[in-house]
């Protein structure tokens, strides 16, 4: 990948000038100027996903400059570098090949001259066999009973991706009950264990190194809980599987290494649900549906890799997002799914985006001080959010671009629930774009029989300025295929922005310092002695903790 400071490109300079030209043009104005705006600013994928980006402060000139920016920042060669296994994660000297995990064509993908696809397919075949044994009831626990509950123990990408997907695809779940434990807070594992029976519970321990503090602490507590009931060490092998590469420690824990599913250092945690880390997904929805998830992602990979920039959905979303943050001043983006099954989708891409692009040092090692990298990502399902934080989106002083996501078809078509849900989905983007003027507010009062003199003091508070940018992502139906495509779409959006920001999107050094300090503090918490080895604030907090515990 080439290291190019985006602000040194001609396109960036053109965008800065263009921003001034557009400064007095609103989204309302743009819709008046361009009669076919919806047709010209929307894209479809596989006739199953519609992405409408027309309600943004952009015109064709904006898009032209943004596309030129992508070209000047060598996006095309960066894409090929990723897909062909170049070590684009330079700070860890690793390839970035989550796309190989869902490479359904089996076209060779080389890392250090070796095709990774045979190993990928071997793990998938092993996962398929394991799923069949668990789901069919062939696999038995220590008392001869079939498995009824699966507890995935992981953290970060080993938890959030599988949890998000199993929740999103609950309509496809089988009889197995899925549970996810991530937090090292003992409450998380304790409350989960209250819900399950040791005789019929399978634990998946998801840790590549089998040394992750939170995961191994929870796994050890689960092991202790099982053995308290089973009273026989041999029971561990019947109730635990590992998603790991550390065979020595897996075996030492008591897990049969035949039930260890490996993945590779070219799979980043937040991009790992497509790997063995997705075993909980495959157990929940069945392996055929897991393959459909991979198929959807693979189709989006092909779209991203080969579709021209003008019709390229992930690239377009990335460029529009970059325009909103770096030229219009937005610091956050909201992801607002109008689908209760997608209730963890925003949290998943909060990790995906912020851990990838939350960087302040560029690929040359220079501090970035003249442009903004990754935005803050947040969100909740609609319509809940409407009764919580939409007030600020509509009438606050902060610009918050939003992605609205909704399925055209519901898995639960109860009465008129879905029409009511979707009426809100459509209404919100219309309200955010077009607002309500003072004159419209006054006309409403007059129509209601009110005197303008009586209501003049309330009128300003009912005005909506509009001109708030949104994308609308309408999915025909949330299926394993479309969900796979949707997730891959956001993954590639993150990649494109990282390329243009000139940062390394696939490391996460920012998580290390806190872990190092926690390891230093942990031994200090074992006794009641006062500490004085830190700053006065940290000393004071630790000492008060010791007094109160």
Curated annotation (Swiss-Prot):
Its main location: cytoplasm. Keywords: Cytoplasm, Gluconeogenesis, Glycolysis, Isomerase. It is an enzyme of class 5 (isomerase). Pfam families: PGI. It is found in: Cytoplasm. It catalyses: alpha-D-glucose 6-phosphate = beta-D-fructose 6-phosphate. One of its GO terms (biological process) is glucose 6-phosphate metabolic process. The keyword Secreted does not apply. One of its GO terms (molecular function) is glucose-6-phosphate isomerase activity. Pathway: Carbohydrate biosynthesis; gluconeogenesis; Carbohydrate degradation; glycolysis; D-glyceraldehyde 3-phosphate and glycerone phosphate from D-glucose: step 2/4. Its EC number is 5.3.1.9. PROSITE patterns: P_GLUCOSE_ISOMERASE_1, P_GLUCOSE_ISOMERASE_2, P_GLUCOSE_ISOMERASE_3. The keyword Metal-binding does not apply. PANTHER family: GLUCOSE-6-PHOSPHATE ISOMERASE. Belongs to the GPI family. This is Glucose-6-phosphate isomerase.
């Amino acid at each position: 990948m080439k290291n190019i400071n985006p602000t040194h490109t001609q396109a960036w300079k053109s965008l800065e000038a263009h921003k001034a030209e557009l400064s007095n043009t609103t989204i309302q104005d743009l819709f008046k100027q361009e009669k076919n705006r919806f047709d010209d600013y929307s894209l479809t994928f596989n006739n199953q996903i519609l992405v409408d980006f027309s309600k943004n402060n952009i015109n064709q000139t904006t898009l032209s400059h943004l596309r030129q920016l992508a070209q000047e920042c060598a996006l095309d060669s960066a894409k090929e570098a990723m897909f062909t296994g170049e070590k684009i994660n330079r700070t860890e000297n690793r390839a970035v090949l989550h796309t190989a995990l869902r490479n359904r064509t089996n076209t060779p993908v080389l890392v250090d001259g070796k095709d990774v696809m045979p190993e990928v397919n071997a793990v998938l075949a092993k996962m398929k066999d394991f799923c069949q044994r668990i789901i069919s009831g062939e696999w038995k626990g220590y008392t001869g009973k079939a498995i009824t509950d699966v507890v995935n123990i992981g953290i970060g990408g080993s938890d959030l991706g599988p949890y998000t997907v199993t929740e999103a695809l609950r309509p496809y779940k089988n009889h197995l009950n899925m549970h996810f434990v991530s937090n090292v807070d003992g409450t998380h594992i304790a409350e989960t264990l209250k819900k399950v029976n040791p005789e019929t519970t399978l634990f998946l321990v998801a840790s590549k190194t089998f040394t992750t503090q939170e995961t191994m602490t929870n796994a050890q507590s689960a092991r202790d809980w099982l053995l308290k009931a089973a009273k026989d060490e041999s029971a561990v092998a019947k109730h635990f599987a590992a998603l790991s590469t550390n065979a020595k420690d897996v075996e030492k824990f008591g897990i049969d290494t035949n039930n260890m599913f490996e993945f590779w250092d070219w799979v980043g945690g937040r991009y790992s649900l497509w790997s063995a880390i997705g075993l909980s997904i495959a157990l929940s929805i069945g392996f055929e549906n897991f393959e459909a998830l991979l198929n959807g992602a693979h189709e989006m990979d092909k779209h991203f890799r080969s579709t021209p920039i003008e019709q390229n959905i992930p690239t377009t979303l990335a460029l529009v997002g970059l325009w909103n943050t770096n030229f219009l001043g937005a610091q956050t983006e909201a992801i607002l799914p109008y689908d209760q099954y997608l209730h963890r989708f925003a949290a998943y891409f909060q990790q995906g985006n912020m851990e990838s692009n939350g960087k302040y040092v560029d690929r040359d090692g220079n501090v970035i001080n003249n442009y903004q990298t990754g935005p803050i990502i947040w969100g909740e399902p609609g319509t809940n959010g409407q009764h919580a934080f939409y007030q600020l989106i509509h009438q606050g002083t902060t610009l918050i671009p939003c992605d609205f996501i909704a399925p055209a078809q519901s898995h639960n078509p109860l009465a008129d629930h879905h029409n009511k849900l979707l009426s809100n989905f459509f209404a919100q983007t219309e309200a955010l774009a077009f607002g309500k003027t003072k004159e419209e507010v006054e006309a409403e009062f007059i129509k209601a029989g009110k005197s303008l003199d009586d209501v003049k003091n309330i009128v300003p508070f009912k005005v909506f300025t509009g001109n708030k940018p949104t994308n609308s992502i309408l999915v025909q139906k949330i299926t394993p295929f479309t969900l796979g495509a949707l997730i891959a779409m956001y993954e590639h959006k993150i990649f494109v922005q990282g390329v243009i920001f000139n940062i390394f999107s696939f490391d996460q050094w920012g998580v290390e310092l806190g872990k190092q300090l926690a390891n230093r503090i942990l031994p200090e918490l074992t006794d009641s002695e006062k500490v004085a080895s830190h700053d006065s604030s940290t000393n004071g907090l630790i000492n008060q903790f010791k007094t109160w515990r």
